[in-house]
Swiss-Prot record:
Record-linked HAMAP family: RNase_T
Protein name as it appears in the record: Ribonuclease T
Family (UniProt): Belongs to the RNase T family.
One Pfam family named in its UniProt record: RNase_T
Domain of life from the UniProt record: Bacteria
Organism: Salmonella typhimurium (strain LT2 / SGSC1412 / ATCC 700720)
Summary of subunit composition and partner proteins: Homodimer.
Length: 215
């Protein structure tokens, strides 16, 4: 077995980071003051040949925290009615506690050391998740406090597109605009897109890295 064959595990691929795809829907742009309304998380796994694929999924509608701003423009954009009882919304604590529990198990099972968020325009999703975790006083946050994998940047490099829908189409994937701005759908599409970019780099010979040769 070559040394390169040892690099097919998830723990080897991203320096021990465990990638978790996240998307949020919110009632504005300010993570400190505007409500988190929906969040979805998809973990990733690798098969024995080192191909990346989606694994486990969690999805929650979230109750606005006490005193949260609800910007009408944001609600019109994502079509969410925070007061609709049919949403089955849970607290920020309940949503993130469940997601963090799933992620910590994935970290342990894969031999990774810490989770890293994968998201499209990741700064936005990261800021809202971290602010919600702080409000919920969740101490065991498995995610890196600032490092992310941004599929907008990766798509710009690999596909020449930065908009999620256009990047998916450029990658040969389907994208239903009617389902966009649902956290679950956008997370699923982002997960498949990230896996395609990582796997395409592998197919092109970019991974595993070539072994250094002595001259």
């Amino acid at each position: 077995m070559s040394d390169n064959a040892q690099l097919s595990g998830l723990c080897d691929r991203f320096r021990g980071f465990y990638p978790v795809v996240i998307d949020v829907e919110t009632a504005g742009f300010n993570a400190k003051t505007d409500a988190l309304l929906e969040i979805a998380a998809i973990t990733l796994k690798m098969d024995e040949q080192g191909w990346l694929m989606p694994d486990m999924t969690l999805h929650f509608h979230v109750e606005p925290f006490a005193g949260a701003n609800l910007q009408p423009e944001a609600l019109a954009f994502n079509g969410i009615d925070p007061s609709n009882p049919l949403r089955g919304a849970v607290s920020e604590y309940e949503a993130l506690h469940a997601i963090f529990k799933m992620v910590r198990k994935g970290i342990k099972d894969s031999g990774c050391s810490r989770a890293i968020m994968v998201a499209h325009n990741a700064t936005f999703d990261h800021s809202f998740m971290m602010a919600a975790a702080e409000r919920a006083s969740l101490k065991r946050n498995p995610f890196h406090p600032f490092v992310t994998f941004d599929t907008a940047a990766l798509s710009g490099l690999a596909l020449g597109q930065t908009v999620l829908s256009k990047a998916c189409l450029a990658a040969g994937m389907e994208f239903d605009g009617e389902k966009a701005h649902s956290a679950l759908y956008d997370t699923e599409r982002t997960a498949v897109l990230f896996c395609e970019i990582v796997n395409r780099w592998k197919r092109l010979g970019g991974w595993p890295l070539p072994l250094p040769t002595d001259k």
